[in-house]
């Protein structure tokens, strides 16, 4: 495994953590079978432009793997100069603890190469193949979603602190609750609304909290956040 970064210190720090080697972008482009393009969309063209010759001169097959939001496979191929095999992925931060949700789509990739890719990525979490037309929408839910969940956990902890809980305990309880609730949704196969109703006893405290969230537009705000993220992703892809 080879790592390259425009800031050498960052590459060296990550290499020390993972037990990898550091090198240059050109060296990665010339030697690696699977080349991860981990830059922001607006930086992709500047990254690939000086690598076109190196990629074109390679005698062996390779795959470009892009995680740049909004950039289509066709656009990546255009920037790289040829219709190279490309896998486009949308990871999220929970992948760093093996609990990610990663969507992917590909072009000019063989079934065997796809299986090798899935085997490599499996430790990061769940992977799901989607049509490229849906990957920006998927990213807006699971790619951006962790930030909103962190906000929710923080807000829950704030509420717990306001009611007298120590900060560390409030945060632990909130985070474990979110983890367990998500696990129940995935493993039970039940609709989230059904699971919500099961917690809300008639005249109880939970339904009063649900009422307050509805009064403040909680559901609509979350939906609007996803749509706003989706629109921004589409905008970045045009830049």
What are these regions (language model features)?
Residues 21-26, 128:
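Short acidic-hydrophobic, aromatic-tinged amphipathic segments that line or gate anion-handling sites
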Residues 175-239:
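NAD(P)-dependent Rossmann-like dehydrogenase/reductase catalytic/cofactor-binding core
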């Amino acid at each position: 495994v080879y790592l390259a970064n425009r800031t050498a210190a960052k590459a060296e720090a990550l290499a020390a953590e993972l037990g990898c080697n550091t090198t240059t972008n050109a060296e990665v482009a010339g030697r690696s079978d699977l080349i991860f393009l981990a830059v922001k969309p607006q930086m992709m063209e500047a990254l690939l432009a000086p690598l076109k010759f190196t990629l074109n001169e390679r005698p062996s097959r390779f795959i470009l793997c892009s995680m740049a939001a909004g950039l289509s496979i066709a656009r990546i191929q255009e920037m790289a100069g040829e219709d190279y095999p490309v896998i486009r992925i949308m990871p999220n931060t929970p992948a760093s603890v093996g609990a990610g949700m990663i969507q992917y789509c590909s072009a000019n990739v063989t079934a065997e190469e796809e299986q090798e890719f899935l085997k490599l990525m499996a430790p990061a979490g769940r992977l799901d193949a989607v049509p490229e037309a849906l990957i920006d929408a998927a990213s807006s839910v699971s790619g951006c979603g962790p930030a909103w969940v962190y906000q929710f956990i923080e807000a829950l902890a704030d509420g717990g602190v306001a009611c007298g809980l120590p900060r560390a305990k409030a945060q632990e309880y909130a985070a474990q609750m979110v983890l367990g609730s998500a696990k129940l949704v995935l493993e039970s196969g039940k609709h989230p609304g059904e699971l919500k109703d099961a917690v809300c006893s008639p005249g109880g405290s939970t339904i009063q909290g649900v009422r307050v969230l509805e009064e403040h537009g909680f559901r609509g705000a979350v939906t609007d956040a996803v749509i706003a993220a989706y629109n921004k992703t589409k905008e970045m892809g045009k830049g």
